[in-house]
Design a protein with these regions (language model features):
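Conserved small/polar residues in nucleotide/adenosyl-binding loops
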Residues: 175-184
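Membrane-interface helix-boundary motifs at transmembrane edges
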Residues: 73-82, 160-168
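Cytosolic-side transmembrane helix boundary signature
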Residues: 145-173
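Alpha-helical transmembrane segments and their helix-start/interface "positive-inside/aromatic belt" motifs
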Residues: 2-13, 80-89
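N-terminal signal-anchor transmembrane alpha helix
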Residues: 14-21
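Hydrophobic cores of alpha-helical transmembrane segments in multi-pass inner/ER membrane proteins
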Residues: 56-67, 140-154
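Membrane-interfacial interhelical loops
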Residues: 22-52, 83-143
Length: 187
């Protein structure tokens, strides 16, 4: 039980750390916009984004929380595959969002929200008109690399068999129950 709780908290705080690190990466990528900013301003950006990071980490930790609960009844290979599949999905999702956000900010001048998605789905030709082929290829490569890095982090800290195997399933055998029953009858 303790290992599951530690794993759940580790998953949550890992998501929070990833989101917190994305802000300075974005600022570093657009360092010309932030060249006059002091270190305290960089930390203020992280601080002001923390409530959103905490809530999004909570949303993304809901499925692992259910998987941790399910692991109390058994650690099957199916559960492990679901676990790995979820983190592959999250790695790809986070890499697509972060990479598209980096790429579109240069052209549109604001961070990714529902507006670019609406614009893309209403007129896809106009949405990608200012983007070169090399930018698309580079973006896809960056997404792949970032997704692989994220999954590597998730695998190293959460998904390896050594880490996954620490969640012991409580086993209750028939002989253990009989011995406990006998002790209770003697008292």
């Amino acid at each position: 039980m303790k290992e599951r709780l530690i794993g759940f908290l580790k998953t949550y705080f890992l998501f929070v750390c990833i989101f917190m690190l994305q802000k300075p990466l974005f600022m570093f990528f657009y360092q010309t916009l932030y060249e006059g900013a002091s270190w305290t301003e960089w930390f203020r950006v992280i601080w002001h984004g923390l409530p959103l990071d905490l809530s999004l980490a909570g949303y993304l930790t809901a499925v692992p929380g259910l998987l941790f609960i399910g692991s109390a009844w058994g650690l099957s290979n199916l559960l492990r595959r679901i676990w790995c599949g979820y983190f592959i999905f999250v790695s790809v999702l986070l890499s697509v969002i972060f990479t598209v956000d980096l790429g579109l900010y240069e052209y549109w001048g604001f961070r990714l929200d529902a507006t670019p998605l609406f614009y893309f789905f209403s007129s896809p030709k106009d949405a990608v008109a200012s983007v070169s082929v090399w930018m698309v290829v580079g973006g896809i490569l960056a997404m792949g690399v970032y997704a692989a890095v994220l999954y590597g982090i998730f695998h190293r800290l959460l998904l390896r068999k050594a880490v996954f195997g620490r969640m012991k399933v409580p086993s209750v055998s028939y002989t253990h129950l009989r011995a406990h029953e006998t002790k209770a009858n003697l008292v």
